[in-house]
C-alpha cells in the first residue's frame, strides 16, 4: 500500500489538529540551606508571605522571609532528611486548619490533625490561621458574664464575654489550674472552649485532658497541642490555629472561651524562628514585631454584633451576637511584671489576674493579689447579685493588707482596728477555694452575703472553711428551689435578700459547723 504526498500531508494536519498540550505552570525552587528547621530556597519568584511551600515527603513549610533572591521558610514537621538541592513548589495557599463542631472533644496538633487515637476529625471546613480581627463598627460592648466559678475572680475581677483577661504569675502559682477550672465551669453554660497548650510536656497535657474528661468538660472543649518536643514553628503557630477554631463559633452567633497556655513560650519559639531567619534582634533578643505577634492574636478575641453574624452566615443566623473570650497566660521570672513580654501583653489585654508566689506558699489559693489584679471592662458584665454583694470585699481586703503591714510594728491596737483585721482575715479565708471545685452564682452570692452582713463575726477563723461547706450543704438540702432561681436569673432584690437573711439566721441557729 502506497501513500501519496497529499494523503500524508492530510494525515499530519489531522494529527496536529487533534494534538492537545496541557501545560501546568509550577513555581519551583531549590533548597540552598537547611538549619534547625529553617530552610532557604532559591527560585520561588512569586511566593506570598505566609504561603505554604510543598516539600518532598508530603510536608510543608511556611514562607516567612521574602528576600531579593531567596525565600526563608520554616518547616512544619521533621526536617532531618531535607538536603541542599531538593526541589520545592509553591502551593498558592495560605495555611488553613480544620474548623467545626466535630473538633469538640478532640485533641489535635497545630495543623488540626488528630493525635488522640479516636480516628479522623469530622470538620465543617477550613479556615486560615491568620485572619484580620473584626473592626470597631462590627463589635458590641461586653455586657454578659463568663463565670469562672472562683469567688475571688467573679467577685473582684469579673470577666465578660468577648474580654481578654491575662492570667500572670511565676511558675507553680496555679495559672493553668485557674484556666482549667474556668473551662470546667463552662460545661453547662453553652460556652464552647479551646485550650491551646504551647511548649509543655506531653505528660502535663495528658493530665489536663484526663482532668477535663473526668469533670465532663472535654466534650465541650477542643485541645490544641504543640509540645516542647515539636518544632519552634509549630509552637509559634499553635495559638493562631486555636483562635481560628474558636472564631468558628464566634462568627456563627455563639460564645467561645480560649485559653493560651502560655504566650511566654510562644514568644520564645518566635524569637528562635526569627533569629534563625537572621532577623535583627531587639530587647531581650526578641524581634521588633513581638508586640504585633500578640496584639494581632488577642485582638481577634471580641464580641461581635448581630449584623456581623448575619452577614457572615448570609442570613442563616439572625439577632444573635457572638463572642470569643481569651484567657492568655504569661509566666513571669521572680515576679517581674515589668519584663518585655509581660508588659506587652498587659497593655494589650483588658485586665490581669496576678497570682503571687508568697500568697500561694502561705496557703491562700487561688493566690490572687487583689491589689494589682484588675478587670477593665468586666464590671459591666457582672451578675447583679454578685455585683451588689461584692462591693465591700475588695475594700475589706485592701484595708486588711494595709493594716496587717502596720500592725506588725504597733504593740496595742484599738478595737476598731482589731475588728477590721479580724474581718479581713476571715474574708481572705472565705475566698480560698479547692481546685476542680467551681461554685455556682447562687453559692457565691450566699457566701458573699454572709461575709457582707457580718455573719462571720462570731465564727472562729479556723472554722470558716467548715462553716462555708456546712452552709452550702444546708441550702442544697433545704432550699434548692431558691438556689435554682438565683442561678437562672442572677437577680437580686428585697425578696431574695430577705430569703438569704432567713436562711443564714436559721443556719446560724443550728450551730452545725
Swiss-Prot record:
Keywords: ATP synthesis, ATP-binding, Cell inner membrane, Cell membrane, CF(1), Hydrogen ion transport, Ion transport, Membrane, Nucleotide-binding, Translocase, Transport. The record marks 373 as: Required for activity. GO terms for cellular component: plasma membrane; proton-transporting ATP synthase complex. ATP binds at residues 169-176. It catalyses: ATP + H2O + 4 H(+)(in) = ADP + phosphate + 5 H(+)(out). It is found in: Cell inner membrane. It is a peripheral membrane protein. It comes from the Bacteria. InterPro entries: ATP_synth_asu-like_sf (IPR023366), ATP_synth_asu_C (IPR000793), ATP_synth_asu_C_sf (IPR038376), ATP_synth_F1_a_nt-bd_dom (IPR033732), ATP_synth_F1_asu (IPR005294), ATPase_a/bsu_AS (IPR020003), ATPase_F1/V1/A1_a/bsu_N (IPR004100), ATPase_F1/V1/A1_a/bsu_N_sf (IPR036121). GO terms for molecular function: ADP binding; ATP binding; proton-transporting ATP synthase activity, rotational mechanism. Its EC number is 7.1.2.2. F-type ATPases have 2 components, CF(1) - the catalytic core - and CF(0) - the membrane proton channel. CF(1) has five subunits: alpha(3), beta(3), gamma(1), delta(1), epsilon(1). CF(0) has three main subunits: a(1), b(2) and c(9-12). The alpha and beta chains form an alternating ring which encloses part of the gamma chain. CF(1) is attached to CF(0) by a central stalk formed by the gamma and epsilon chains, while a peripheral stalk is formed by the delta and b chains. NCBIfam families: atpA, PRK13343.1. Belongs to the ATPase alpha/beta chains family. Produces ATP from ADP in the presence of a proton gradient across the membrane. The alpha chain is a regulatory subunit. This is ATP synthase subunit alpha. The lineage of its organism: Bacteria, Pseudomonadati, Pseudomonadota, Gammaproteobacteria, Enterobacterales.
Amino acid at each position: 500500500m502506497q501513500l501519496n504526498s497529499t494523503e500524508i500531508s492530510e494525515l499530519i494536519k489531522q494529527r496536529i489538529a487533534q494534538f492537545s498540550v496541557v501545560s501546568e505552570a509550577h513555581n519551583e525552587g531549590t533548597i540552598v540551606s537547611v538549619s534547625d528547621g529553617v530552610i532557604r530556597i532559591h527560585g520561588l519568584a512569586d511566593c506570598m508571605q505566609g504561603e505554604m511551600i510543598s516539600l518532598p515527603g508530603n510536608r510543608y513549610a511556611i514562607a516567612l522571609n521574602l528576600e531579593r533572591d531567596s525565600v526563608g521558610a520554616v518547616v512544619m514537621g521533621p526536617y532531618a532528611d531535607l538536603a541542599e538541592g531538593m526541589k520545592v513548589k509553591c502551593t498558592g495557599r495560605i495555611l488553613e486548619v480544620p474548623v467545626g463542631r466535630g473538633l469538640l472533644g478532640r485533641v489535635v496538633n497545630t495543623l488540626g490533625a488528630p493525635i488522640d487515637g479516636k480516628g479522623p476529625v469530622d470538620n465543617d471546613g477550613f479556615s486560615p490561621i491568620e485572619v484580620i480581627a473584626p473592626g470597631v463598627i462590627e463589635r458590641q460592648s461586653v455586657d454578659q458574664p463568663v463565670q469562672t466559678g472562683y469567688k475571688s475572680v467573679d467577685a473582684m475581677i469579673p470577666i465578660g464575654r468577648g474580654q481578654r483577661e491575662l492570667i500572670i504569675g511565676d511558675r507553680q502559682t496555679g495559672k493553668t489550674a485557674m484556666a482549667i477550672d474556668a473551662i470546667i465551669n463552662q460545661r453547662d453554660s453553652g460556652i464552647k472552649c479551646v485550650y491551646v497548650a504551647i511548649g509543655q510536656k506531653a505528660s502535663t497535657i495528658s493530665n489536663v485532658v484526663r482532668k477535663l474528661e473526668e469533670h465532663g468538660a472535654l466534650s465541650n472543649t477542643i485541645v490544641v497541642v504543640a509540645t516542647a518536643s515539636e518544632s519552634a514553628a509549630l509552637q509559634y503557630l499553635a495559638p493562631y490555629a486555636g483562635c481560628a477554631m474558636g472564631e468558628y463559633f464566634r462568627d456563627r452567633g455563639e460564645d467561645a472561651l480560649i485559653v493560651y497556655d502560655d504566650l511566654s513560650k510562644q514568644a520564645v519559639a518566635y524569637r528562635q524562628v526569627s533569629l534563625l531567619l537572621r532577623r535583627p534582634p531587639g530587647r531581650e533578643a526578641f524581634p521588633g514585631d513581638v508586640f504585633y505577634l500578640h496584639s494581632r492574636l488577642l485582638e481577634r478575641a471580641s464580641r461581635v454584633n448581630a449584623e456581623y453574624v448575619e452577614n457572615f452566615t448570609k442570613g442563616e443566623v439572625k439577632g444573635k451576637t457572638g463572642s470569643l473570650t481569651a484567657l492568655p497566660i504569661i509566666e513571669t521570672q521572680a515576679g517581674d511584671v515589668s519584663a518585655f513580654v509581660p508588659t506587652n501583653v498587659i497593655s494589650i489585654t483588658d485586665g490581669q489576674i496576678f497570682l503571687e508566689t508568697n500568697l500561694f506558699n502561705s496557703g491562700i489559693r487561688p493566690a490572687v493579689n487583689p491589689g494589682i489584679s484588675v478587670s477593665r471592662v468586666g464590671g459591666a458584665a457582672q451578675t447583679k447579685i454578685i455585683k451588689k454583694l461584692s462591693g465591700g470585699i475588695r475594700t475589706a481586703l485592701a484595708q486588711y493588707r494595709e493594716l496587717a503591714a502596720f500592725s506588725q510594728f504597733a504593740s496595742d491596737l484599738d478595737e476598731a482596728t482589731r475588728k477590721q483585721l479580724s474581718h479581713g482575715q476571715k474574708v481572705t479565708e472565705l475566698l480560698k477555694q479547692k481546685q476542680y471545685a467551681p461554685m455556682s452564682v447562687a453559692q457565691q452570692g450566699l457566701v458573699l452575703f454572709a461575709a457582707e452582713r457580718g455573719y462571720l463575726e462570731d465564727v472562729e477563723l479556723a472554722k470558716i472553711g467548715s462553716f462555708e461547706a456546712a452552709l452550702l450543704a444546708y441550702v442544697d438540702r433545704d432550699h434548692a428551689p431558691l438556689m435554682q432561681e438565683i442561678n437562672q436569673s442572677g437577680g437580686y432584690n428585697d425578696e431574695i435578700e430577705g430569703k438569704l437573711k432567713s436562711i443564714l439566721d436559721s443556719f446560724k441557729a443550728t450551730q452545725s459547723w
